[in-house]
Amino acid sequence: METTYRREALTVRVIFCTSGDSAETIADVLTGAPTSASFFSVLHDLFYSQILAPRVTLKLCLPARRPGNGTRCSPVLVLRTDASVASGFLGGRPLEASDIKYMLLSDQTAGLFKPLLEIIGGARAPPNQDACTFQSQVAWLRTKFVTALRKLYKMTPSPYWMLSAFGAQEAQFVLTSSFYFFEHTVVCTTETVSHLSRLFSPQQGQTLVSVTSHEELGQLYGTSPFRRRVPAFVAYVKEKLARDSLETEAIDRTIDQIRGKLMLSNQDLVHFIYISFYQCLNKRAFLRYSRQTSSSSALRELGEDPQLCGALHGEFRDHVQSYYHKKTYLSTYIDIRYVGGVLPDGYFGGSLVGERCVYWCGQSKDTASLLATISQQVPHLRLQNEFAGMLDVAALRGSDDGQFKEGLFSHSQALPLYRCEFLGKQFFTMLQEDGLERYWEQSVIFPGDQDWDMLSDKDLTYRIFYHDLSLSLPTLKEQLLVSRHEYFNPRLPVYRWVLDFDLPVCRDIDRTFEEVHSLCCSLREAILDIIQLLGPVDPRTHPVYFFKSACPPDEWRGEDVASTSFCRCHDKLGMRIIVPFPEGVCVVGSEPMVALTGILNRTIKLDPELVHRFPSIQKKGGPFDCGIYGRGRSVRLPHCYKVGLVGELCRLLKILVCHPAPNGKAQYVRRAFTLRELLHHSPGHSAGHVGRIIYSIMDRNENFLENKTISYLPAKIPHIFQRIETLSGRSIEDWLHSAVWDKAYDTICKFFPDEKAQQFSHVAFTQQGENIIQLRPRQGRHFLCINHNHKNKSKTVRVFLTLHSIRVSEVTVTLMSQCFASKCNNNVPTAHFSFVVPVGLAS
């Protein structure tokens, strides 16, 4: 049954077009100039079939060029005509411009353009301004007026932009365009309305691909049966958007409730939010929700309670909350594997004490020569010719494998391997006897004979004095007493957990002893929580030794230092932390130590109080370096100096007493100056006895948020190099030169400084890995830093292209670089720009 519109006065908004230049045609109509153009109705807001009102007011509108959240169309002409004429016009019959002049309501139309004419008129007033009419104003300013219309409104000769924006199916176009132009109480994107139109009307009507003119589009709109459904569609959109808002607010609220109880790093937070939204809005859940909200009646049946956020309850929430809670994390997700047996020896005990230093030392060429000699004499050892072979030599013991050591030392035992910087060179040293403890006895002053247990940690720390040095010593033997680094040896058992702690801190902020000591106490608690997973210890008395890197000298700061200041470090606060494993426990291999330190990094990130006081703990992987347990990695010993660029001694690792137990402070301090208590592989008291040999430590859910996120991302196309070569018929290098590098080099020249861009004028490509192409300059192997102008302008920066594809028709190419400078995040890859290269990857 057709609906009629019974009003004495009816106003209809019409989106129109003309047969000629619309801006010029409007100016002709307003000035009374002769024109043969015709006006066509494209869209209008009269959604009923019959008009019974005798007269109709037509507001002819044009689409706004940049509407933002404002009005999408604005009237430019106001007409009044008979119902029959209006009905024909709205149904697709054109109106001639000559007829429109007689229908024009001049006063109302003039009111529409008054602000515009005032702006474009400016100081150029027409003659006889007092007697000037609206028609004469438009005529006087016609050129500017026409230009302004073109800037304000979208006037195109083709309907293609409308079909692209609102859809090429009849129902989709009619419903979406009508809502977009004539419904201003709800603001949402065209894509959203288009999606809702497909939900609202499964029947889409005829296709519009054959429509080539606004006239044809207007005729289709004027006769479309879907036009009558626009009011119902508007009501549905409002209900649907209200329901969507309810659901999204519930999702946000639930996510905030869950993450408010979690200690998440920035990276983990991004992954958590992505996974949370995926849980609620993945394809299956979204399609199910769309079916449940496809009509007004279905929306009413859904009830008032939100549906989508239910996916965040249950297993996912419990899993996240238990993993990101310190107690449940350590008790649930850490897997430790061990075997029972006699604990192996570490370093030979006699090599850690002595009245003097007895050692072998040499530089890189000497170690290579020694390894070559040993390999000739004892070939079955299969020693590496590189420095890693020295670690094998240091670990060998016994009359069989280690007999060649008797030519170097008086016995064949496992020895520590150190690195010492002297005279600007690196010396590698194995010691059979070590006078380091005796040197400490002579160069460090301890408190008097009073009861040390009566002193606080602060008093003890302040009453231990070092003999400060500032310059390297005359001989290598003396230099070994003040500066050395111990190498981690994967072939020896680990009895002590040596930790390298670097915490980024704010510049120009001094810290009191109490603040640093509180940090140490929190770290001690976290370390002992993990140590107790390996074996039983008394957390009140088990020693954890802290050695803080000395602050820069006062003169470096150029300002007064407050008397209460204990730490004046800027950029980072560095400490060496050492804790013995429980009695009857040792760890073998690098991997368990790396995993154990990674667990510690995660554990301290789960301490809300600690993170609140030191937010930088959450940065990157954590403040504890997991890389010091690899082959060929070394750390500076406590009570030793760092050697500067010109041989100066600085940043002494001084003891910071942190032993909360009321008793045992004297023993704690004395052991902190005992060499066997400070090394990775010095034997424990239980070496040679039956105990636990731990060979695997694993976080069962390590990086589970990241891994889960990756599993939800679109799958990458594998073997990308082979596919490109097969389908293009060219080698990767030829394809890069012809299809990739020109675009990459143009981008480099456009956005990089000239001195940085010119080094890329001639490059070679080297395939590295499955999807990495390394760039080589014409001269040398690497490039200058792209990010910063470092003082050291050496060409050490690695630049490469990564290829990534998730669509069979294109490859995403990213230019990346790695710089070793601390200002560039110490070799962390930096992405500079990406672009897409079309390629036929479909097989």
UniProtKB/Swiss-Prot annotation:
Family stated for the protein in its record:
Belongs to the herpesviridae DNA primase family.
Q: Kindly list the residues the record flags as site (Essential for primase activity).
A: D500, D502
The organism's lineage is: Viruses, Duplodnaviria, Heunggongvirae, Peploviricota, Herviviricetes
Molecular function terms from GO: ATP binding; DNA-directed RNA polymerase activity; helicase activity; hydrolase activity; zinc ion binding
User: What Pfam family does this protein match (any one)?
Assistant: Herpes_UL52
Role summary: Essential component of the helicase/primase complex. Unwinds the DNA at the replication forks and generates single-stranded DNA for both leading and lagging strand synthesis. The primase initiates primer synthesis and thereby produces large amount of short RNA primers on the lagging strand that the polymerase elongates using dNTPs.
Where can this protein be found?
A: Host nucleus
Enzyme Commission number, as recorded: 2.7.7.-
The name this protein goes by in its record: DNA primase
Q: How does it assemble?
A: Associates with the helicase and the primase-associated factor to form the helicase-primase factor.
Task: Give the principal location in a single coarse category.
Answer: host cell
Q: Where are the zinc fingers (CHC2-type)?
A: 785-824
Keywords (A to Z) from UniProt: ATP-binding, DNA replication, Helicase, Host nucleus, Hydrolase, Metal-binding, Nucleotide-binding, Transferase, Zinc, Zinc-finger
Q: Secretion signal: which residues?
A: none
